């Protein structure tokens, strides 16, 4: 009593405390960062190594395996995958959440150093690492185009100056430059001219390497001067290399230009980048795992004027893709939804109370509670994101509940003629324990979420803490500010002998009278109500098993990403044509705003595309509907497939796959994996529950297999090393020398001129100089035949791996897809040597599925414990928790009605319902117990009176929560696919719960009261018919 009086009789102090809470919240709001979702990125580091010309199998065995053995010893590695292709290896290390990315990077560098001695010679550089996830979509893509600059020159400018500057911006993890390669001097050899002059390819290579050196020459000095020695030992341009003497034939000099075409070109001619049908250089910017995407993008945009100032006038720099506008639009939608929810909740209060002064009290309590939460969010290191703002939107219905319960009880005393301050004190004292019970039991629901581990735990923690803090502040406000305002703002009135006869009052009286009549009937037919209650429990179980499930709702971020997979024997020229064809099809779609793409590099038959859609308000279709429409058009392109997927704010794993979900096959036997992967992929492709099925195992690349006759080689004076060196020199784009420039280093690349290597007959023109100086044709000691070869070799851990990626057709849930895959694997009879498991998002989904029921049971158990402690009873908490089955049925039925799968967002809704619907029972049970203790009523009379007396606040709190959640259901625009499942779950659960628990709770109360008396061996009074 004294605690409540302290605030009621000291209004100035109470107002200033509320103002302080509000001011702290406003300050916290201004300091909070903005993000699409809570920070849930796994720390990921990518290690890259190259050996130009090496086959995928060579890269896997000689480069990937030594690095993997060394990197696998690092502590905290969650998953290690690698992919080796022509001339390159990439290893992805995914660490545990609690691993510091900088500490992990130091360990990675130490592991690379330890493996250095085991790596093959001839690598142009040491392996490097980057602190970024290559499977993440770029947060921003910049394009460089020019009418006068070559692609190589543009690439050089982009990588040397722009990428270096952008990489220094806070939050940037990686700037990947694509579309071409660095400038280089290319030496295109003429095999016939070399044969005529008797010059070997090794001789050419050694002559070039010896002619271009960079060594210190020292200095000369006397007593007065010092002269630095400088020579023309470096060759920098093609024109300087052409007259280079590489051989003497009968005393005549043979110059490089006599046997080769020497041009200023690029290191790798098999690269192409485009933006909207124009050749372009792409700068694909990815953030650090722990970085905030909005702050990083803002930092890049702030740097753009400086970047444009340093760019020559001939270059056009444009933003081709930016993830931030849709994120900002989504958050703006949530903020508008929050404002609408607050307005609707206050409207509900006004309709019930029909008093401007009375409505002003919760109208003040709600913003104080919500705004004050921002201060706690800032102190906890949270951000303004979709989930935290949705928590505040839902909190509007919660925080007003406490104020409504206190306000309604005080108003009841005022209507009975009590003085305002006395009514405030008496009313608050009566419901103080009820309000505390409701709030603490609601917060208890979220305790299991706070203890939940893994990605789901990280994702839900911010939501749970934000909502819990809002409820806590609301509890304080409702027991301090609300009674004070009631005592000083509301006026007492004479007791009314007749109920109100106008508007909502008349409707409420009619509802209350109807409820009283129906409740009498129910209390006289308890067995029927018991059957209904047991039926809702059984229906819950059936609906939960039957409802389709997924991990996270598919988002429409306005950005699509696509992977091109062409015939494995396709040439680069043909692949570039496929890229152009696909880009034209997509660019012609009316919903597409911009499209960029690139192909080439180590995987000639693949490419990537990034599509920016028009803003949500300018298109009618969702991202998935656009993908479905484009899939039909893209399927008509022969010889290649483009797999599109909508970019998501959550992407798990480091695999770069051509679809949203992955199923990985592992085996210690590469032969077994290559045998079974095509069978499994074919079977999965036939499943209607899957779409866009594809695999990263590509074993049908065209290969020319050379078989050496070692006896003949020995007789001719040729060794295998010389033969292999010939092939590398001729066809491996071999980097044979380095050109040093002030801003960068460039390579001299040697190969047979493409004009002389158009087909397999080029091998017949190759020759080796033997130990006697004679030119021996390759055909003298080698035979060749066509064969199939892998275009890539993949590992997970130290096992051979193949990942089958898939998307979901419209209307199919992830649970249906995973069940179909597991069923197919069983039917195929896959041997134990080949192991299959879901990876990435699908793996997290399965882990979440296994813990969902445990989480729900843990929440119910926690609430039971808290209520048991508060009521000092084993029985009354069960009565209160009996409200849950009807809410579960309503939520699951609503999801089915709206064709929405049960996702992590829907799980949040179920957890919230556990906290919401029990409030009705708490208000009933509290007043029934008080009536039994102080009024001497029987249990039946007490619960009947409690139900009628608390009917108005129950209706108010339920409608407030319902109208607070309703904007989530009705919201459209950006991010609505995240908000709607939460709103559907809560609204469905509240409607069903309100219809049933008003009747089932009294029946359960009486049942447990009889049970309690029976176990205590006391004679219970007979149930009095009402």
Curated annotation (Swiss-Prot):
Any one GO molecular function term: xenobiotic transmembrane transporter activity
Primary localization class, coarse: membrane
Name of the protein described by the UniProt record: Multidrug resistance protein MdtC
GO CC terms in record: plasma membrane
Transmembrane spans: 15-35, 333-353, 360-380, 387-407, 431-451, 463-483, 528-548, 853-873, 897-917, 953-973, 984-1004
Subunit description: Part of a tripartite efflux system composed of MdtA, MdtB and MdtC. MdtC forms a heteromultimer with MdtB.
Domain of life: Bacteria
Family, as annotated: Belongs to the resistance-nodulation-cell division (RND) (TC 2.A.6) family. MdtC subfamily.
Keyword annotations of the record: Cell inner membrane, Cell membrane, Membrane, Transmembrane, Transmembrane helix, Transport
Subcellular location: Cell inner membrane
InterPro entries: AcrB_DN_DC_subdom, Acrflvin-R, Multidrug-R_MdtC
Topology in the lipid bilayer: Multi-pass membrane protein
Gene: mdtC
HAMAP family registered for this protein in UniProt: MdtC (MF_01424)
């Amino acid at each position: 009593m004294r605690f409540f009086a302290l605030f009621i009789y000291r209004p100035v102090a109470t107002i200033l405390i509320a103002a302080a809470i509000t001011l702290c919240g406003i300050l916290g709001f201004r300091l909070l960062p903005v993000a699409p979702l809570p920070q849930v990125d796994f720390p990921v580091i990518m290690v890259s190594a190259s050996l130009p010309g090496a086959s995928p199998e060579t890269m896997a065995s000689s480069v990937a395996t030594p690095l993997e053995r060394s990197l696998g010893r690092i502590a905290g590695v969650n998953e290690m995958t690698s992919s080796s292709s022509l001339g390159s290896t990439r290893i992805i290390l995914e660490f545990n959440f609690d691993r510091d990315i900088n500490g992990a990077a130091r360990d990675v560098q130490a592991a690379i150093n330890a493996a250095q001695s085991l790596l093959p010679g001839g690598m142009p550089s040491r392996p490097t690492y980057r602190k970024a996830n290559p499977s993440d979509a770029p947060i921003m893509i910049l394009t460089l185009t020019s009418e006068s600059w070559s692609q190589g020159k543009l690439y050089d400018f982009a990588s040397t100056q722009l990428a270096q500057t952008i990489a220094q911006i806070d939050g940037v993890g990686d700037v990947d430059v694509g579309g071409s390669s660095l400038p280089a001097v290319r030496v295109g050899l003429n095999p016939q001219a070399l044969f005529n002059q008797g010059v070997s390819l090794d001789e050419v290579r050694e002559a070039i390497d010896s002619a271009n050196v960079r060594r210190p020459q020292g200095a000369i000095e006397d007593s007065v001067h010092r002269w630095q020695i400088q020579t023309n030992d470096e060759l920098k341009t093609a024109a300087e290399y052409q007259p280079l003497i590489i051989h003497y034939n009968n005393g005549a000099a043979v110059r490089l230009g006599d046997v080769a075409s020497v041009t200023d070109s690029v290191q790798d001619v098999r690269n192409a980048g485009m933006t909207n049908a124009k050749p372009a250089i792409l700068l694909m910017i990815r953030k650090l795992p722990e970085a905030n995407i909005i702050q990083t993008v803002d930092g890049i945009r702030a740097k753009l004027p400086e970047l444009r100032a340093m760019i020559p006038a001939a270059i056009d720099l444009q933003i081709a893709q930016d993830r931030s506008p849709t994120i900002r639009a989504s958050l703006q939608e949530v903020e508008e939804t929050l404002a609408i929810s607050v307005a609707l909740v206050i409207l509900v209060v006004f309709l019930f109370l029909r008093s401007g002064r009375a409505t002003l009290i919760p109208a003040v309590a709600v913003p104080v509670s919500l705004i004050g939460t921002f201060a706690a969010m800032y102190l906890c290191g949270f951000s303004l994101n979709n989930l935290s703002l949705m928590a505040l939107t839902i909190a509007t219905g919660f925080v007003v509940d406490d104020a409504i319960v206190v306000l309604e009880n005080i108003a009841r005393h005022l209507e009975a003629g009590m003085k305002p301050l006395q009514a405030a004190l008496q009313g608050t004292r009566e419901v103080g324990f009820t309000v505390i019970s409701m709030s603490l039991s609601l917060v208890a629901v979220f305790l299991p979420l706070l203890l939940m581990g893994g990605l789901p735990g990280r994702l839900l923690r911010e939501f749970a803490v934000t909502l819990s803090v809002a409820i806590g502040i609301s509890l304080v406000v409702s027991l301090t500010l609300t009674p004070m305002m009631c005592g000083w703002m509301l006026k007492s009135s004479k007791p009314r002998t007749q109920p109100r006869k106008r508007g909502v009052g008349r409707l409420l009286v009619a509802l209350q009278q109807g409820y009283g009549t129906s409740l009498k009937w129910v209390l006289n037919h308890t067995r029927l109500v018991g059957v209904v209650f047991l039926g809702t429990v059984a229906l819950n179980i059936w609906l939960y098993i039957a409802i389709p499930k997924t991990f996270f709702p598919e988002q429409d971020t306005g950005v699509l990403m696509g992977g091109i997979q062409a015939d494995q024997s396709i040439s680069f020229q043909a692949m570039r044509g496929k890229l152009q064809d696909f880009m034209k099809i997509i660019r012609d779609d009316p919903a597409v705003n911009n499209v960029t793409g690139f192909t080439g590099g180590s995987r000639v038959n693949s490419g990537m595309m990034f599509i920016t859609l028009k803003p949500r308000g300018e298109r009618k279709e969702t991202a998935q509907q656009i993908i479905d429409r484009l899939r039909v058009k893209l399927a008509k392109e022969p010889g290649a497939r483009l797999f599109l997927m909508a970019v998501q704010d959550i992407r798990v794993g480091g695999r770069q796959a051509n679809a949203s979900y992955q199923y990985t096959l592992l085996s210690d036997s590469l032969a077994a994996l290559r045998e079974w992967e095509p069978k499994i992929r074919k079977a999965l492709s036939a499943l209607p529950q899957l779409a866009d099925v594809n695999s990263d195992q590509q074993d049908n690349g065209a290969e020319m297999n050379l078989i050496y006759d070692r006896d003949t080689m020995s007789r001719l004076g040729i060794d295998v090393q010389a033969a292999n060196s010939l092939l590398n020199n001729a066809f491996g784009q071999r980097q044979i020398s380095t050109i040093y420039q002030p801003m960068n280093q460039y390579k001299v690349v040697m190969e047979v001129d493409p004009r002389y290597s158009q087909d397999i007959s080029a091998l017949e023109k190759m020759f080796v100089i033997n130990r006697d100086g004679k030119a021996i044709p390759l055909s003298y000691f080698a035979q060749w035949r066509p064969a199939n070869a892998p275009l890539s070799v993949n590992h997970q851990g130290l096992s051979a791996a193949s990942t089958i990626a898939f998307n979901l057709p419209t209307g199919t849930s992830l649970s249906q897809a995973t069940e179909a895959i597991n069923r197919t694997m069983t039917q195929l009879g896959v041997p134990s040597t080949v192991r299959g498991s879901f990876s990435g998002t699908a793996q997290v989904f399965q882990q979440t599925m296994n813990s969902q029921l445990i989480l729900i049971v843990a929440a119910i158990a926690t609430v039971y414990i808290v209520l048991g402690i508060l009521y000092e009873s084993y029985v009354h908490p069960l009565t209160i928790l009996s409200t849950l089955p009807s809410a579960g049925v309503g939520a699951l039925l609503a999801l089915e009605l709206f064709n929405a799968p049960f996702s992590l967002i829907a799980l949040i809704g179920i957890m919230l319902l556990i906290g919401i619907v029990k409030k009705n029972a708490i208000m009933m049970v509290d007043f029934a117990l008080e009536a039994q203790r102080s009024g001497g009523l029987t249990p039946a009379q007490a619960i009947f009176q409690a139900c009628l007396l608390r009917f108005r606040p129950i209706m108010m709190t339920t409608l407030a929560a319902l109208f607070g959640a309703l904007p989530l259901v009705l919201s459209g625009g950006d991010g609505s696919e995240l908000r709607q499942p939460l709103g559907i779950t809560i609204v469905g659960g509240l409607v069903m719960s309100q219809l049933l628990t008003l009747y089932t709770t009294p029946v359960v109360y009486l049942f447990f009261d009889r049970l309690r008396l029976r176990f205590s061996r006391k004679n219970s009074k007979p149930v009095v018919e009402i």
